[in-house]
């Protein structure tokens, strides 16, 4: 409704009246209702007697007594006594008779009232300008609302507006907030404020001002963040208006506004201007209901408001926004709510205002008006229907005005749209046009927050659109669109996206399902956030004896497990389409089967509702982790409705309505989900467009508010009944439903298949008009009258005509007219002109679907008007829900249909049709047409310009003598006076204080030598290692302080110091008494010499002081060399100290075992050498002063005799393989030798035998050039016996012929553990042509250096004749070498050891191995095969293209050329000493062990991590993983052998060739090299650490187990690794398989022994580690040395016996809170199960244990 053009005049008048009413200066009853009883008005608002000062009202209190209390309320002024007709329901008490001359008195008093108003305005404005600060309003702009339940409070202006509030709607069951004090009598003193002003919201206010929103309609959503916008209403009493007992004790309380979460409110106030400062009054609903707030929106009404604001102050400007209905001081009464209206009492309304917004002035009129709403209120067709009803008939109020505003016209239209099918004639009992519009201002409408409130949630919303991939969509011939759920279906969502945090108290669940199996299954479930129990759900049991149960799962808050609230047993319906519905209302639950009530059972539940956590889950066809049973079958419909009533139209398929193709708000039903019908959901909350003028009778097939048409459904000889009509008081209409056709037996008659949609039929004839309605309805509109567009009462609701008497009692509602008979279907013809749109008619009974009609003929009609905006559709969030627990979450990983934000506002609708001009209005307050008296005096004008200065006035009389003045300030200093006479000599003064000591004098001449000084502190020890063996005079510093030795003889006197600079002369000091002997001071640094001073007197010599303690400072001057002191040996590892006292060096103790070097060949025992001659004494060393300067030569002590030889140390670990050197120069060619005879093969069955001494070298053959090296898998073999040479391979392809090189003589076997013969054979080029046999040549000259320089022999010569077959050797581990290109295929060998591998291609011919010596050694060996005949010698080939290794000096150089390196080649960067391997599309770094110093005798070995080699044989499909022997030296010297004893290794299968030099690589799948490989036949369990430390928050034991599994797989470990942790459900001891606990050793990643068995670890001694034990991570890092683990502690959560400690495992390893603790052990203490509770925020080592030894998987 557009504002009236002439409303400004009355607005100005009301503005003045409002200000006066604010100051209690004026009674405005005459303005609003000229027929009001003045006796009531006199007690309500006292009239002023002249201008009265405005008094603050904060000190006036109103004692409000609970309604059931016995104490009468002590009512303050402004709180009238309620009339008797409302105190007792059902008894009509006659109202006070009005005096017949009341109108005349009213007219006569207008002039006096106006004069009083004018005077009051002047006083009030002046007082307001002087007392109200501008910033007081700004502080009152922020709204703080109480949630979830709180009273509706109005904050009125007082001396402290922020501290004042009057409770309007008291809440029930809320604890008293601070500041609310209850007396012994049960009353609560509360301040009585004045009515609220514009800027003061109707709730307690705190904080700074909020900038106003820019839209015309505002809500709290713009201010209060993104909390879920939900307002939940309690269902009204099922009996409607039946009398109810008084509400329980209620107290008016001040709301607690602290620590609350504000809500977005669904009901807001309309606003006119562009700038609206939102404010709200909140409703505290009883019980556990959520809050529904009505938000008042103030606005800027135009320039005149700002003008008044500038004139009278901000408070008055704010008051101007509420003009229109003048909510602050209307004439009326605030009365207690009668018990006959429990529907409003449930909303928290305890008092209401009369007259209401329908101008009812008595309780009887209110009850009569409420009868027309009785049936509609029971339908719950709109979520805010009860609010609309109560705001209209019983507007809530406090003890003082104003009442709550009326609902807006748009609110009314939204109700009419949602409830049209439940209305008789499609109309509400009130005309929406009679209510103010949103643009008019002071009214309540539905805000944006209500658009997300869903009264019904359907299947497609719960599944998402599109549904998850595991849920398939089908088109069933019986029901249409349906969804198939299999065993893998997953459809979890967050419940709070569809339901409020406080779930519906009463509700219904509707299903249309067809089970596919006889097993149990959950149809629907809402779980807690942990998915531990089902809060609400429906479950089908398994079929037993032809029956199955349907259970309602309803778990009360605080319960520990899922509770079955009710269970119904019915015949099994597997494979049958069945309608099921559960209705939960109050204390009962009812089951409906195929639309008939099957059984009703009591439901025991508390008054508390279901609180849904933020992470609560919502599932369809399952219950997530709370229940493993999943429903398997087809679901066509699933609805969760807030309405507990289950009607046939909800239960049955709406087959006749093709436009209703969806179930729920967003649809999941049988038609197009995009078309939504809102007739049942009540969710079409957006206001519709203004409807055209109604016709007399609605058509039979009308249009929905969101659909263009409904299909025609006509059944012959059937009367169309009103859908959902209820029997209203005083009417005879019968409640009927038109759901489906029923047979005489009462069963539902199933219809046939759906046909196609027919064309709309011809509208039937209009029905007969009904009898006239209530006389209270407004008449036709009149001409615009001077009325404000702001207010809800008075002319804004209904135009008040001229003088008329008070309205009589309302008549009874007329019975609705009968619906017209349905017309016969007309023949299809050309469509006629479009007629006026009629009201939607009631749907007829469901009839059979007709055939689709022919399309109409004719031109296309004009487009219809734009429809209202549709309901919000589901939005889809593409991010997946993340849940903490890794043990399995029922939430789906698919796109989830989560409700999205509100869309943009739609385009403005078309302008309405202008109304007819009304009759000229009359002045509404006089009884005649004569003009009224003069108006009020105007507001004071602006300040005029200053006048001319006046003439000076006459002098005034002399004033009285003033009070004495204050004492003056001190004057300034005067000038200096004349000098005085000389005084007499004074008495001698007292002795002065003793002066400070003078500066130190200059050093005197050198005195005689003094006695020897006291012994100094012990000097530092000597280091464990000496650079020169003869000793040095310089200082030595040890790594640890030695023990104090015996006192040595006194040292020589020190050198003479330099003379100092002369110091200033000082006064002679008095000789002091001898002081107490002090401790020797620390030597200080030499200071700057002062000037020479006078010589002081020599003091007496003090006594010798005690020896001082060790000081901290610069070292003193060293003394002269003394006799030889003790030589101290300090261990570099553990800091232990060994010393040998005595002047001369005696033979020392046995030294610590040195690091293990590589095991060499067995040499002959050498004789003990004699000690070398003693060297000459060196030059004396220098002596240094504290500042670093050299003072003089020092003397060197004599060297002691060499000590005895210590015992032999333990065997060291084998050394690392050396780097591959470059090929040496080819030797001089020799003569080809004669072919030797074939040797006899060795007998492999004899076991391992000793090999004989090597024979003389054979004649050299023609050497070939070295080719590309290949990988040698047996570089470090563990066996002590060499094997015979392998089988010769097939002849390789010929290579390019090279120049003939010189042949060098073969050198003796070297000491370096490398197979040079094999390497050379692998580096050969392609075989050349066969040469002629030559004579034996002379011995060639020695070669000029081998691979590693001239100190080593050159490479072996060409292969000689094969020798006799030796005994087979033990296969050694894989060694570090160069991975070459695959050679040509060799012949298939016999099966190897272990599981059969796949057959590989034949290898290249292998040369015989170099001679070896008997006994243990580290020479490379091969698994021998029977010797074959040697191939014919070829001509020398050219030099190979490459050795398979590329060297670069820097990493930058490597990055520039690495793309040129073939895949599989090794790359060495000299600058960083790093090794890389070229892989597909990049390169990978090879992890190396720590550097090992070269042992004596070798100078070319370097540590290298042995990369894995996977050998594939044609007959073995499983890869064989070789076991690298440990090659690192021990990290500390101890008595542990570097090579721990290994378990016995079985010998290989007889005759199995070991393809040690051939590697089959898979070029298509380059993988990262595993850090470990292990033999199949060795039973061990590995204990390995994760690659990075973890805090106590590991996402549970399953999260840690998963990381162990994942990282073990990444390095090629196929066993099952579990975290070395105790948890809530497992002890650490029980992780390893029972069969492997007693005898299987525990080793690290390098197979170094850690514990002899799993049980030995839990012997109660906290798992002591052996000295030198190492623990590696999966990527090969030593956790005790690597900086990745700064804290060397291990999580375990166990006691020493491996049992879990429930108080110390970081809350099942799920938290990293500093306050939580977990049991850990420090590895620095040498124990794996040490008992130390540490904070869970620390990042410690997490170990993984292989829980069983599985040979086949390793």
Curated annotation (Swiss-Prot):
Post-translational modification: Prolines at the third position of the tripeptide repeating unit (G-X-Y) of the triple-helical regions are hydroxylated. Circulating endostatins are found as sialoglycoprotein and asialoglycoprotein structures.
Laminin G-like domain span: 456-644
Cysteine-cysteine disulfides: 334-397, 344-390, 381-419, 408-443, 412-432, 1604-1744, 1706-1736
Region (Nonhelical region 3 (NC3)): 876-899
Principal subcellular localization: secreted
Region (Triple-helical region 4 (COL4)) location: 1045-1127
Glycosylation sites: 68, 129, 164, 889, 926, 1567
Pfam families: Collagen (PF01391), Collagen_trimer (PF20010), DUF959 (PF06121), Endostatin (PF06482), Fz (PF01392)
Region forming the signal peptide: 1-23
InterPro entries: C-type_lectin-like/link_sf, Collagen, Collagen_superfamily, Collagen_XVIII_Fz, Collagenase_NC10/endostatin, ConA-like_dom_sf, CTDL_fold, DUF959_COL18_N
Gene source species: Homo sapiens (Human)
Region: Nonhelical region 4 (NC4), residue numbers: 1022-1044
The protein, known as: Collagen alpha-1(XVIII) chain
Primary role: Probably plays a major role in determining the retinal structure as well as in the closure of the neural tube.
Effect of residue 184 to K: In GLCC; uncertain significance
């Amino acid at each position: 409704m557009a504002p009236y053009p002439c409303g400004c005049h009355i607005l100005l008048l009301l503005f003045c009246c409002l200000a006066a009413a604010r100051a209690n200066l004026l009674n405005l009853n005459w303005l609003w209702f000229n027929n009001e009883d003045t006796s009531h008005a006199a007690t309500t608002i006292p009239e002023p007697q002249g201008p009265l000062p405005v008094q603050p009202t904060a000190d006036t209190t109103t004692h409000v007594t609970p309604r059931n209390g016995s104490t009468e309320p002590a009512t303050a002024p402004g709180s009238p006594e309620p009339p008797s007709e409302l105190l007792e329901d059902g008894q009509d008490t006659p109202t006070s008779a009005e005096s017949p001359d009341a109108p005349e008195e009213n007219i006569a008093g207008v002039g006096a009232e106006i004069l009083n108003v004018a005077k009051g305005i002047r006083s009030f404005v002046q007082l307001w300008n002087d007392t109200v600060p501008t910033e007081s309003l700004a502080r009152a702009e922020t709204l703080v609302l109480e949630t979830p339940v709180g009273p509706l409070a109005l904050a009125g202006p007082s001396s402290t507006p922020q501290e004042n509030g009057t409770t309007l709607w008291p809440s029930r069951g809320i604890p008293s907030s601070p500041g609310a004090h209850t007396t012994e009598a049960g009353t609560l003193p509360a301040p009585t404020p004045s009515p609220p002003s514009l800027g003061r919201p109707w709730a307690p206010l705190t904080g700074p001002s909020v900038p106003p929103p820019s839209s015309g309609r505002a809500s709290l959503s713009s201010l209060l963040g993104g909390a879920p916008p939900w307002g939940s209403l309690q269902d009204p009493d099922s009996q409607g208006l039946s009398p109810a007992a008084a509400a329980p004790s209620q107290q008016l309380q001040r709301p607690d506004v602290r620590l609350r979460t504000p809500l977005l409110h669904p009901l807001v106030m309309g606003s006119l201007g562009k700038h609206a400062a939102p404010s709200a009054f909140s409703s505290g609903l009883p019980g556990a209901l959520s809050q529904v707030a009505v938000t008042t929106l103030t606005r800027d009404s135009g320039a005149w408001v700002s003008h008044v604001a500038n004139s009278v102050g901000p408070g008055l400007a704010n008051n101007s926004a509420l003009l229109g209905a003048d909510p602050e001081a209307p004439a009326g009464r605030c009365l207690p709510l009668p018990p006959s209206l429990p529907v409003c009492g449930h909303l928290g309304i305890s008092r209401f205002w009369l007259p209401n917004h329908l101008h009812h002035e008595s309780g009887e009129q209110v009850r009569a008006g409420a009868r027309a709403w009785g049936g509609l209120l029971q339908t719950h067709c709109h979520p805010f229907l009860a609010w609309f009803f109560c705001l209209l008939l019983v507007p809530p109020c406090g003890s003082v005005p104003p009442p709550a505003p009326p609902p807006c016209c748009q609110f009314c239209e939204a109700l009419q749209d949602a409830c049209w099918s439940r209305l008789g004639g499609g109309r509400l009992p009130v005309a929406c046009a009679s209510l103010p519009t949103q643009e008019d201002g002071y009214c309540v409408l539905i805000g944006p927050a209500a658009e997300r409130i869903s009264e019904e949630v359907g299947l497609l919303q719960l599944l998402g659109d599109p549904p998850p991939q595991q849920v398939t969509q089908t088109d069933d011939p019986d029901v249409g669109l349906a969804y198939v759920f299999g065993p893998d279906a997953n459809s979890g969502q967050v419940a709070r996206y569809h339901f409020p945090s406080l779930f519906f108290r009463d509700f219904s669940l509707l299903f249309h399902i067809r089970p596919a199996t006889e097993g149990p299954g959950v149809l629907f479930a809402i779980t807690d956030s942990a998915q531990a129990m089902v809060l609400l759900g429906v479950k089908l049991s398994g079929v037993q004896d032809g029956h199955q149960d349907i259970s309602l799962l309803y778990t009360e808050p605080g319960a520990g497990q899922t509770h079955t609230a009710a269970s119904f047993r019915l015949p099994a319906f597997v494979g049958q389409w069945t309608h099921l519905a559960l209705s939960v209302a109050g204390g009962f639950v009812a089951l409906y089967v195929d639309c008939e009530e099957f059984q009703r059972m009591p439901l025991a539940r508390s008054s508390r509702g279901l609180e849904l956590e933020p992470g609560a889950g919502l599932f369809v066809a399952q219950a997530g982790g709370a229940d493993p049973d999943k429903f398997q079958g087809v679901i066509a419909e699933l609805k969760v409705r807030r309405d507990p009533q289950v009607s046939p139209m909800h239960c049955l398929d709406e087959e006749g309505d093709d436009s209703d193709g969806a179930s729920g708000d967003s649809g999941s039903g049988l038609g197009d989900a995009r078309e939504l019908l809102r007739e049942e959901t009540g969710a079409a909350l957006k206001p519709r467009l203004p409807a055209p003028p109604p016709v007399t009778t609605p058509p039979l097939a009308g249009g929905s508010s969101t659909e263009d048409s409904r299909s025609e459904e006509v059944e012959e000889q059937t009367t169309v009944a009103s859908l959902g009509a209820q029997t209203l008081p005083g009417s005879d209409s019968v409640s009927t439903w038109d759901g489906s056709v029923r047979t005489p037996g009462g069963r539902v008659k199933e219809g046939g298949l759906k046909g196609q949609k027919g064309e709309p039929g011809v509208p039937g004839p209009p029905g007969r008009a009904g009898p006239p309605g209530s006389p209270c309805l407004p008449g036709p509109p009149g001409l615009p009258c001077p009325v404000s567009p702001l207010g809800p009462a008075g002319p804004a609701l209904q135009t008040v005509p001229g003088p008329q008497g008070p309205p009589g009692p309302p008549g009874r509602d007329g019975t609705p007219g009968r619906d017209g008979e349905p017309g016969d279907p007309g023949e299809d013809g050309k469509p006629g002109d479009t007629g006026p749109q009629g009201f939607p008619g009631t749907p007829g009974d469901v009839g059979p679907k007709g055939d689709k009609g022919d399309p109409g003929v004719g031109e296309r009609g004009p487009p219809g008007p734009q429809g209202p905006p549709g309901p919000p559709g589901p939005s889809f969030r593409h991010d997946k829900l993340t849940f903490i627990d890794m043990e399995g979450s029922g939430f789906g990983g698919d796109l989830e249909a989560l409700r999205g934000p509100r869309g943009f506002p739609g385009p403005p609708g078309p302008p309405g049709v202008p109304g007819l001009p009304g009759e000229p209005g009359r002045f509404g307050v006089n009884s005649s047409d004569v003009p009224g008296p003069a108006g009020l005096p105007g507001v004071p004008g602006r300040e005029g310009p200053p006048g001319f200065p006046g003439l000076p006035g006459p002098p005034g009389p002399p004033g009285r003598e003033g009070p004495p003045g204050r004492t003056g300030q001190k004057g300034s200093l005067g000038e200096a006076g004349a000098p005085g006479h000389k005084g007499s000599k004074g008495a001698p003064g007292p002795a002065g204080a003793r002066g400070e000591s003078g500066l130190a004098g200059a050093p005197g001449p050198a005195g005689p030598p003094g006695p020897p000084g006291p012994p100094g502190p012990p000097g530092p020890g000597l280091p464990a290692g000496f650079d020169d063996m003869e000793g040095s005079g310089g200082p030595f510093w040890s790594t640890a302080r030695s023990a104090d030795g015996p006192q040595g003889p006194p040292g020589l006197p020190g050198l003479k110091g330099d003379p100092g600079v002369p110091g200033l002369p000082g006064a002679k000091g008095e000789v002091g008494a001898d002081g107490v002997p002090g401790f020797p001071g620390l030597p200080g640094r030499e200071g700057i010499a002062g000037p020479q001073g006078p010589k002081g007197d020599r003091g007496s010599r003090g006594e010798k002081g005690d020896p001082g303690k060790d000081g901290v400072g610069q070292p003193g001057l060293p003394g002269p060399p003394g006799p030889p002191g003790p030589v101290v040996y300090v261990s570099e590892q553990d800091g232990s100290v060994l010393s040998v006292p005595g002047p001369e060096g005696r033979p020392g103790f046995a030294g610590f075992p040195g690091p293990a070097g590589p095991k060499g060949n067995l040499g002959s025992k050498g004789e003990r050498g004699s000690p070398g001659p003693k060297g000459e004494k060196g030059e004396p060393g220098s002596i240094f002063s504290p500042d670093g300067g050299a003072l003089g030569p020092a003397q060197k002590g004599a060297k002691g005799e060499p000590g005895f030889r210590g015992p032999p140390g333990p065997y060291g670990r084998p050394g690392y393989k050396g780097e591959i050197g470059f090929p040496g120069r080819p030797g001089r060619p020799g003569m080809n030798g004669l072919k030797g005879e074939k040797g006899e093969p060795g007998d492999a069955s004899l076991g391992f035998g000793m090999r004989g001494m090597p024979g003389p070298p054979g004649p050299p053959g023609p050497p070939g050039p070295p080719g590309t090296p290949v990988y040698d898998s047996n570089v470090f073999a563990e066996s002590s016996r060499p094997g015979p040479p392998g089988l010769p391979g097939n002849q390789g392809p010929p290579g390019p012929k090279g120049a003939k090189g010189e042949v060098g003589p073969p050198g003796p076997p070297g000491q370096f553990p490398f197979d040079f013969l094999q390497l050379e054979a692998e580096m050969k080029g392609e075989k050349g042509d066969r040469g002629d046999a030559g004579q034996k040549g002379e011995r060639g000259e020695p070669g000029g250096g081998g691979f590693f320089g001239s100190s080593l022999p050159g490479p072996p010569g060409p292969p000689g004749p094969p020798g006799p077959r030796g005994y087979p050797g033990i296969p050694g581990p894989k060694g570090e070498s160069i991975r070459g290109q695959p050679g040509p295929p060799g012949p298939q060998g016999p099966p190897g050891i272990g599981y059969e591998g796949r057959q590989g291609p034949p290898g290249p011919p292998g040369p015989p191995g170099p001679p070896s010596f008997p006994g243990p050694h580290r020479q490379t060996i091969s698994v021998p095969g029977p010797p074959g005949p040697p191939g014919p010698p070829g001509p020398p080939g050219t030099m190979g293209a490459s050795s398979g290794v590329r060297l670069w000096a820097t990493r930058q150089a490597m990055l520039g050329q690495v793309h040129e390196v073939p895949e599989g080649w090794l790359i060495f960067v000299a600058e960083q000493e790093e090794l890389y391997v070229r892989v597909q599309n990049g390169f990978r770094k090879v992890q190396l062990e720590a550097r090992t110093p070269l042992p004596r005798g070798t100078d070319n070995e370097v540590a290298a991590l042995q990369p894995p080699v996977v050998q594939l044989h044609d007959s073995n499909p499983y890869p064989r993983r070789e076991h690298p022997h440990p090659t690192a030296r021990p990290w500390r010297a101890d008595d542990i052998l570097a090579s721990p004893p290994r378990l016995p290794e079985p010998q290989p299968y007889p005759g199995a060739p070991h393809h040690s030099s051939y590697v089959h690589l898979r070029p298509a799948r380059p993988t990262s090299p595993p850090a470990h490989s292990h033999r199949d036949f060795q039973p061990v369990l590995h204990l390995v650490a994760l690659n990075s430390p973890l805090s106590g928050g590991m996402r549970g034991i399953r999260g840690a187990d998963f990381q162990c599994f994942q990282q073990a797989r990444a390095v090629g470990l196929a066993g099952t690794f579990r975290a070395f942790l105790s948890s809530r459900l497992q002890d650490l001891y029980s992780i390893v398989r029972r069969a492997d606990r007693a005898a299987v050793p525990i080793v690290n990643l390098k197979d170094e022994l850690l514990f002899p068995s799993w049980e030995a670890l839990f012997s109660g001694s906290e798992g002591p580690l052996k000295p030198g034990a190492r623990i590696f991570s999966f990527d090969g890092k030593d956790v005790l040395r690597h900086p990745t683990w700064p804290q060397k502690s291990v999580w375990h959560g166990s006691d020493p016996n491996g049992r879990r400690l429930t108080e110390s495992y970081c809350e099942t390893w799920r938290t990293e809170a500093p306050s939580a603790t977990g049991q850990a052990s420090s590895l620095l203490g040498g124990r794996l199960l040490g008992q130390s509770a540490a904070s869970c925020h620390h990042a410690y080592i997490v170990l993984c244990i292989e829980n069983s030894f599985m040979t086949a998987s390793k």
